[in-house]
């Protein structure tokens, strides 16, 4: 029996995340915010301010500065940072972290912070490769007297003729390339290419002009290359400074037993020294001076910045003043609170006043009932849910009275209840009411805890 099986596609279903609907900042060409665009509703002033920040980043005039997104929970601070990253595109590095991420048992706080700083700084390296490509028409090694004496002779250079569709060239090559040509077993009639910078030689195949020469031959025939024999290709590579740090910090293991055993054991996280970073900075600066590389300052986004302690804030002060630093976007939903790591020093947003004075602060404001309704309709469309107008009003009411997050979280359970209850028209008001009874919001839960406090442990 002939075996026939279906090949399944490897396309993945994208999960609808909290900010899937955000596609950009939703700005007009003149920089003013549209009422609703790119998944955004409201927050016009904050979006316009972020648009100015994006323009400064693109003009490379924002490096070493910091922005604070300040506002209550559910006002779109993380969404603004995500929109900034999408406006900048994939070529500009964007490194999002949470304030609590930098605490580790293996690596000190300031090291983890610096690591993320370096992740947010890109380096665009442009390399021009010169290549000679064509069919070999002549292969003549030139001999010379052996400089060590005796009767032996050495290869002084190699004369090679290359032919392409647009012309021919005769090259004088180094004897080291002759060895590479011998290894590749190149003969007249083969198509080869030689890299001028490295001297690497590669045999592509036999010219198709010789295809009828033999009846039986396990040879790959290729056409004569188009264009000139001498070609220039520009290769652009994007790396971050952290990639360079890691490449130089990890020592290559030897061949002895102890090195091999060390490689088998679980490796500890390497802490990159300040001296190594300074050496890499010197090399990077030299590349920039030569015009080989170009620095691309990216964005480091630190969410819940009030979770950093006083030592981290002090380090941030210094890091922002360094010659190579990215744009730092901070987000905090705290008002006047105690700075972490201190006993009783309180400040606005949980950030020390000296750092707060350096920040450009962008406020985010609570959404109006109409804006909440539009956001819920947009989320329902993104998640592929049908919702009736009375049900939408009910969910929007929860968004105004309780929180936008609670209202959005009711949508999916309500759609499941609507399907179970056999409602083809989508989510109805009864489904939202049933969901509301099944899942409590934070205020009702707190009221129950206060009412029945003796039934709980603490």
UniProtKB/Swiss-Prot annotation:
GO molecular function: 3'-5' DNA helicase activity; 5'-3' DNA helicase activity; ATP binding; ATP hydrolysis activity; DNA helicase activity
GO cellular component, as recorded: Ino80 complex; NuA4 histone acetyltransferase complex; R2TP complex; Swr1 complex
SUPFAM superfamilies: P-loop containing nucleoside triphosphate hydrolases (SSF52540)
InterPro entries in the cross-refs: AAA+_ATPase (IPR003593), P-loop_NTPase (IPR027417), RuvB-like (IPR027238), RuvB-like_C (IPR041048), RuvBL1/2_DNA/RNA_bd_dom (IPR042487), TIP49_P-loop (IPR010339)
Positions bound to ATP: 71-78
Localization: Nucleus
EC number: 3.6.4.12
This protein's UniProt keywords: Activator, ATP-binding, Chromatin regulator, DNA damage, DNA repair, Helicase, Hydrolase, Nucleotide-binding, Nucleus, Transcription, Transcription regulation
Superkingdom assignment: Eukaryota
Main localization (coarse): nucleus
Ranges for region Disordered: 1-29
Catalytic activity as recorded in UniProt: ATP + H2O = ADP + phosphate + H(+)
Record-level GO BP terms: box C/D snoRNP assembly; chromatin remodeling; DNA repair; regulation of transcription by RNA polymerase II
Quaternary assembly: May form heterododecamers with RVB2. Component of the SWR1 chromatin remodeling complex, the INO80 chromatin remodeling complex, and of the R2TP complex.
Its job: DNA helicase which participates in several chromatin remodeling complexes, including the SWR1 and the INO80 complexes. The SWR1 complex mediates the ATP-dependent exchange of histone H2A for the H2A variant HZT1 leading to transcriptional regulation of selected genes by chromatin remodeling. The INO80 complex remodels chromatin by shifting nucleosomes and is involved in DNA repair. Also involved in pre-rRNA processing.
Name this polypeptide is given: RuvB-like helicase 1
């Amino acid at each position: 029996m002939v075996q026939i099986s279906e090949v399944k596609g490897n396309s993945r279903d994208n999960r609808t995340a909290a900010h899937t609907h955000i596609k950009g900042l939703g700005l007009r060409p003149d920089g003013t915010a549209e009422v609703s665009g790119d998944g955004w509703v409201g927050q016009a002033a904050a979006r316009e301010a972020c648009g100015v920040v994006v323009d400064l980043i693109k003009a490379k005039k924002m490096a070493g500065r910091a922005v604070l997104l300040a506002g209550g929970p559910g006002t779109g601070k993380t969404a603004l940072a995500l929109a900034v990253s999408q406006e900048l595109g994939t070529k500009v590095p964007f490194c999002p972290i949470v304030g609590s991420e930098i605490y580790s048992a293996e690596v000190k706080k300031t090291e983890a912070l610096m690591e993320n700083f370096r992740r947010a700084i890109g380096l665009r390296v442009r390399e021009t490769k010169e290549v000679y490509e064509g069919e070999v028409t002549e292969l003549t090694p030139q001999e010379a007297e052996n400089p060590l004496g005796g009767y032996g002779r050495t290869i002084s250079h190699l004369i090679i003729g290359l032919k392409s569709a647009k012309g021919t060239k005769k090259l004088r090559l180094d004897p080291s390339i002759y060895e590479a040509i011998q290894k590749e077993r190149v003969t007249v009639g083969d198509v080869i290419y030689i890299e001028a910078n490295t001297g690497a030689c590669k045999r592509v195949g036999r010219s198709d002009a010789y295809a009828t020469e033999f009846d039986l031959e396990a040879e790959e025939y290729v056409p004569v290359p188009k264009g000139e024999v001498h070609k220039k290709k520009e290769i652009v590579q994007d790396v971050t400074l952290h990639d360079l740090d890691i490449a130089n910090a990890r020592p290559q293991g030897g061949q002895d037993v102890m090195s091999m055993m060390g490689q088998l054991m679980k490796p500890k996280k390497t802490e990159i020294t300040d001296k190594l970073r300074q050496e890499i900075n010197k090399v990077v600066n030299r590349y920039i001076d030569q015009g080989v590389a170009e620095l691309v300052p990216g964005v480091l986004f630190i969410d819940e910045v009030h979770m950093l302690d006083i030592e981290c804030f002090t380090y941030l002060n210094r890091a922002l003043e360094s010659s190579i630093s990215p744009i730092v976007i901070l987000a905090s939903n705290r008002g006047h609170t105690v700075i972490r790591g201190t006993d009783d020093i309180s400040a606005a947003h949980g950030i020390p006043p000296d750092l707060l004075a350096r920040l450009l602060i962008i406020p985010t404001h609570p959404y109006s009932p109409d804006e909440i309704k539009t956001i819920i309709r947009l989320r329902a469309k993104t998640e592929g849910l049908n919702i009736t107008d009375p049900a939408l009003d009910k969910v929007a009411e929860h968004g105004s009275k309780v929180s936008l997050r609670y209202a959005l979280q009711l949508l999916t359970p309500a759609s499941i209840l609507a399907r179970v209850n056999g409602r083809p028209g989508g989510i109805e008001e009864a489904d939202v009411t049933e969901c509301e009874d099944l899942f409590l919001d934070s205020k009702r839960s707190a009221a129950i805890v206060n009412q029945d406090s003796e039934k709980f442990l603490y």
